Amino acid sequence: AAAAGDSAASDLLGDNILRSEDPPMSIDLTFHMLRNMIHMAKMEGEREQAQINRNLLDEV
């Protein structure tokens, strides 16, 4: 999943852009930032859940 996100980021940064050499539009950058924030929030939630799971297993 991370590779797909990296690919999207590369596309937005112009590494693998298929259209002309136009710079990324501001809406592209806005959605890129939004995707990054959602990804970071998901990772944080998974980290917190993993810690809760560890605590539960320690109690058993």
Curated annotation (Swiss-Prot):
Record's keyword terms, sorted: Amidation, Cleavage on pair of basic residues, Hormone, Secreted
Top-level division of the source organism's lineage: Eukaryota
Major localization class: secreted
Region ranges (Disordered): 1-22
Residue(s) carrying Valine amide: V60
Protein's UniProt name: UI
Alphabetized Gene3D superfamilies for the sequence: 6.10.250.1920
Taxonomic path: Eukaryota, Metazoa, Chordata, Craniata, Vertebrata
